A protein has these predicted regions:
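A short beta-loop-alpha structural element at the N-terminal edge
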Residues: 5-17
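Conserved catalytic-core motifs of GNAT/GCN5-like acyltransferases
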Residues: 71-77, 124-127, 139, 144-161
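Conserved GNAT-fold acetyl-CoA-binding loop/helix
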Residues: 18, 22-45
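Residue-level preference for beta-strand/loop junctions
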Residues: 50, 86, 119, 159-161
């Protein structure tokens, strides 16, 4: 995959990122997001999010084939997914027709560096329990399950467990 370029996301990527994420949302079952997003949503929630540490895109032959977003844990959040200072939160998305090609792993190399540079000691990945591909992806990167939160409502009211995985940045590889 020598023609894969990993670079920081910019606002001009937002339309392609929305297209990529919306395809995943429409298929269903692999993201907690259930409502399609437009360019403005992508800029607000990923490219320029309030607690942004990094957002990287994977580009192949001029086309975005994946992106990975990392926020610092939101100190204002008080819900069931509350994390303390020093934690960061990851979200990863790869075009369905590009799964299994190492794109997420390449993105994570950059994301992990950004997390360390920001002073994070751990990265959280919160994954729907029915997303077996996502659970395996994070497990293969070195994330380990630290808690399962049961019966969390999705935006449509469906109840779903969430598996929380932690990547410990304090352990040398």
């Amino acid at each position: 995959m020598s023609n894969l370029i990993i670079r920081p996301a910019i606002e001009d990527d937002a339309e392609e990122l929305a297209e990529l994420l919306n395809e995943i949302i429409r298929i269903g079952g692999t993201t907690a997001y259930q409502s399609v997003m437009d360019k403005g949503d992508i800029i607000r929630d990923f490219v320029r999010s309030k607690w942004l540490l990094s957002c990287f895109v994977a580009e192949m032959e001029g086309k975005v084939v994946g992106f990975q977003h990392l926020d610092a844990a939101d100190p204002e959040y008080s819900g069931p997914f509350k994390l303390g200072a020093g934690w960061s939160v990851i979200a990863s998305f790869v075009r369905v027709d590009h799964h299994g090609q190492g794109i997420g792993r390449r993105l994570f190399q950059e994301t992990k560096t950004a997390a360390k540079q920001a002073g994070s000691f751990a990265i959280d990945a919160t994954i729907r329990a029915d997303n077996t591909l996502g659970i395996a992806f994070y497990q293969n990167l070195g994330f380990r399950t630290y808690v399962t939160i049961e019966d969390v409502p999705l935006s449509d009211g469906t109840r779903m467990d969430r598996v929380r995985k932690k990547y410990d940045l304090t352990v040398e590889e």
